[in-house]
Amino acid sequence: MSKQHWSRNAARALLGTVLSVAAATAISAPTRWDVNGHYYEVIEVSGGIVWADARAAAQTTSHFGASGHLVTVGSAEESRFLTASFGGDGLENHWLGLFQPVGSSEPDGGWTWVNGESFSYNNWWPGEPNDFGIDGENAGVFQHGITGDGKGWNDLNSDWLVNGYVVEFDVVPEPTMLMLFAGGLLGLTLTRRR
């Protein structure tokens, strides 16, 4: 592939990301889940967005100093919280932070969360993941009309355009009392030495 051809493709990809992010609209302010202290936000993208652009856009956001990433769902309780907070229709056709690395056994091997959390919980719609189609499916999406229990993940090709994505903001650790006390003691010691 020539440098000019590669540069043109890179420019198109960059332009696609910029336009997708520019067209992104938050449905509401980030919502906090008291169980883990994380915040969640559903982002709609006019004209749709591919998985890689959604991942990049999520990573450029922050809320109260916490960096964002595509949502990782680690339990049925967290899944129910998302459905209760945003509704099944609000999550429908939005990217998760779930992907299948190249070379994984198909259709259900190697699924990985973007933040490295263990993939011990899944919420696949019955019959999913199925790696349908000739191009394969390697990214997770909320789909199939989420039911009350949050059932409804599907695997899609990461290059397909979907309605948006869900961002999760991890909690920013607050200083513990012991750290505050130690810092105060250190400050007092340094002041007395002068």
Give short role names for the model-derived ranges.
Residues 27-171:
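Extracellular, disulfide-bonded carbohydrate-recognition/adhesion ectodomains
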Residues 16, 26-27:
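Cleavable N-terminal signal peptides
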Residues 12-20, 178-183:
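Small-residue packing motifs within transmembrane alpha-helices
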Residues 2-14, 175-176:
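Bacterial N-terminal signal peptides that target proteins for export
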Residues 173-191:
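A short, hydrophobic C-terminal helix/tail in secreted or cell-surface proteins
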Residues 5, 9, 52, 189-191:
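Short alpha-helical segments used as structural interaction elements across diverse proteins
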